[in-house]
UniProtKB/Swiss-Prot annotation:
Residues forming coiled coils: none
Catalytic activity: IMP + L-aspartate + GTP = N(6)-(1,2-dicarboxyethyl)-AMP + GDP + phosphate + 2 H(+)
Free-text function comment from the UniProt entry: Plays an important role in the de novo pathway and in the salvage pathway of purine nucleotide biosynthesis. Catalyzes the first committed step in the biosynthesis of AMP from IMP.
Protein name: Adenylosuccinate synthetase
Lineage of origin: Eukaryota, Metazoa, Ecdysozoa, Arthropoda, Hexapoda
Residues annotated to bind IMP: D38, E39, G40, K41, N63, A64, G65, H66, T155, R169, N247, T262, R326
Molecular-function annotations in GO: adenylosuccinate synthase activity; GTP binding; magnesium ion binding
Assigned protein family: Belongs to the adenylosuccinate synthetase family.
Length: 449
């Protein structure tokens, strides 16, 4: 090859390469739970949604529960992205979400009764999202009951069985419901037969279900689009996009405390696969960290406090699951856990929520290390629940501030010890804290920088 030909080929490569790297005029910012869920992601998304064009859900189903307080009204969302409270924002339910249509329409009706309007013009559902059927929920409950004393603490919303159907390639997607209904009927009968064979005690009235889903098809049709094309077009046109992760990093099926996890990837990888986005579209990755730690259901919890401290956190923090209504288990903030989820997710900044719940404490403990029973320090987060359940926790003791922070709106006006608590977390994680929450509403989020 001549020198001139090589130069032409080199320039051609550079032009194409630059075109690929600069094809998107905007980025996708992501909000992820950094612990076991219930960190306050919905409130953070609600705050940021006022400045973006599109808010997306990428995984999970109505096993998630997000509470948003807007204009004095409290909204509970399970399938809908929290951004729906912003009337200027388009909300997207991506291909990675599994959708129980009866629950979706119940949620739409309940929130419309609270004042949400014109959702048909600003909610888009992926045609590739899989459906959760009632028999999935029945199977979920049966599988949990079979485990007896070793139950996983599932929400029994059918999420795991629906993802199982997806993985075994006999699941049904939203787009198939809207296509030839005879083909949908055949697939539905087939998936029911499979589940009845595996679980003989479940009873499905196939004709009644098909009649119901024929009605749902027309109800959901106006909302359904190819969300992959929609999002890529939006990015090329410079539209700003925010992704609301459901559940949290420690519930991720790969990186969480398996098997006490959910059935989807609720870390950064699930954002890409659940929306059809390439890695170069990702901008800020915001980790939402509760100022202490909670989890719902079973599974190891190194910093859990089964004492008056745990009771105080549970009571002051109103720690009851939005979806399950179960009391949340409570404990101290866990730095090794947060370092691990930061490693997996690559947080570019952090939002600390519910700092005000610690207002009454004279002393606050923070987990700073794990060690084995023989005294050996761990330099990694345990990969098995057996190991995690047997470790000993090393704590740092920080002084409390014992004064209310609830009405403070400027970081420098927080008590010095409260500021020190935030800076301690920032220093330990080497990730900047951008916001601190001291109350329920979006107005209670303090911009640190």
């Amino acid at each position: 090859m001549s020198t001139s030909s090589a130069a032409v080929n080199g320039n051609h490569y550079e032009q194409l390469h630059q075109g690929r790297t600069k094809m998107y005029k905007s980025k996708v910012d992501v909000v992820l739970g950094a612990q076991w869920g219930d960190e306050g992601k919905g409130k953070v998304v609600d705050m940021l949604a006022s400045e973006v064009d599109i808010v997306c859900r990428c995984q999970g189903g109505n096993n998630a529960g997000h509470t948003v307080v807007a204009n004095g009204t409290e909204f509970d969302f399970h399938l809908l992205p929290s951004g729906v409270v912003n009337e200027k924002c388009i909300s997207v339910i991506g291909n990675g979400v599994v959708i129980h249509l009866p629950s979706l329409f119940d949620e739409l009706l309940k929130n419309q009764a609270k004042g949400l309007s014109h959702l048909e013009n600003r909610l888009i559902i992926s045609d590739r999202a899989h459906l959760v059927f009632d028999f999935h929920q029945h199977v979920d409950g049966m599988q949990e009951a079979e485990k007896g004393g070793k139950s996983l603490g599932t929400t029994k919303k059918g999420i795991g069985p629906a993802y199982s159907s997806k993985a075994t390639r006999n699941g049904i997607r939203v787009g198939e419901l809207l296509g030839d209904f005879n083909l949908f009927s055949d697939k539905f009968k087939s998936i029911v037969a499979t589940h009845v064979r595996l679980f003989p005690s479940i009873n499905v009235d196939v004709d009644a279900e098909l009649a119901r889903y024929k009605d749902y098809a027309e109800k959901v049709r106006p909302y359904v689009k190819d969300t992959i094309c929609f999002l890529h077009t939006a990015l090329r046109n410079g539209k700003t996009i925010l992704v609301e992760g459901a559940n949290a990093a420690m519930l991720d099926i790969d990186f969480g405390t398996y098997p006490y996890v959910t059935s989807s990837n609720c870390s950064i990888g699930g954002v890409l696969t659940g929306l059809g986005l390439p890695p170069q579209t990702i901008g800020e990755v915001i980790g939402v960290v509760k100022a202490y730690t909670t989890r719902v259901g079973d599974g190891p919890f190194p910093t859990e406090q089964l004492n008056e401290v745990g009771d105080l956190l549970q009571t002051r923090g109103f720690e009851v699951g939005v979806t399950t209504k179960r009391k949340r288990r409570c404990g101290w903030l866990d730095i090794p856990l947060l370092k691990y989820t930061s490693l997996v997710n690559g947080y570019t900044c952090i939002c600390i929520t519910k700092l005000d719940i610690l207002d009454t404490m004279a002393e606050i403990k923070v987990a700073v290390g794990y060690k084995r029973s023989n005294g050996e320090k761990l330099d990694h987060f345990p990969g098995t629940i057996a190991e995690l359940g047997s470790i000993e926790v090393e704590y740092a003791n920080l002084p409390g501030w014992q004064t209310s922070t609830e009405h403070i709106r400027n970081f420098k006006e927080l008590p010095e010890n409260a500021q020190n608590y935030v800076r301690f977390l920032e220093s330990e994680l080497s990730v900047p804290v951008r916001w601190v929450g001291v109350g329920k509403g979006r107005e209670s989020i303090i911009n640190v920088h």
